[in-house]
């Protein structure tokens, strides 16, 4: 069974109810897609570097360390602590999470290493620019690519649930 969300992509933006215009052969959906989509897409405010920076309330490393909160925010990360790791971060653009940082880690290098290891590129890393250097067109292109990543992640999760 193969489900694609491409037919649903634009109806999401044209309708208050994501599923009114999205037909999936009358199948029962194994989880709340709208709720999961909101989780994957948000928090929207983390698109801005200043908001990502403010998410690092109790980051353990100082501004003298390569792995400081300023460098993490510039590299697209925001703080997303888990129960097992207080220094877990997530890239707002590609949704990849990293944890167990050392003070000498370079956020840009680690982000690149993660994307190469996972085999899926991060549009923000590919562009290689910090927020202040982005043009409006580049920002909108990143936003479009981010939406594609969110929908691909949702599709992947649906396939996993349906194949169980």
Where are these regions (language model features)?
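Intrinsically disordered, low-complexity linker/tail regions enriched in polar/charged residues
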Residues: 5-164
């Amino acid at each position: 069974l193969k489900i694609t969300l491409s037919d649903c992509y634009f109806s999401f933006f044209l309708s208050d109810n994501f599923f009114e215009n999205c037909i999936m052969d009358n199948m029962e959906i194994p989880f709340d897609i709208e709720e999961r989509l909101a989780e994957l897409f948000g928090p929207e405010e983390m698109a801005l570097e200043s908001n990502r920076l403010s998410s690092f309330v109790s980051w353990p490393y100082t501004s003298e360390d390569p792995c400081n909160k300023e460098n993490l925010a510039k590299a697209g990360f925001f703080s997303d602590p888990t129960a097992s790791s207080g220094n877990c971060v997530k890239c707002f653009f590609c949704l990849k999470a990293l944890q167990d940082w050392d003070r000498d880690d370079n956020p840009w290098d680690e982000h690149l290493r993660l994307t190469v290891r996972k085999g899926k590129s991060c549009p923000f890393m590919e562009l290689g620019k910090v927020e202040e250097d982005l043009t409006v067109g580049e920002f909108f292109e990143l936003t479009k690519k981010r939406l594609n990543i969110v929908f691909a992640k949702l599709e992947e999760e649906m396939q996993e649930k349906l194949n169980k």
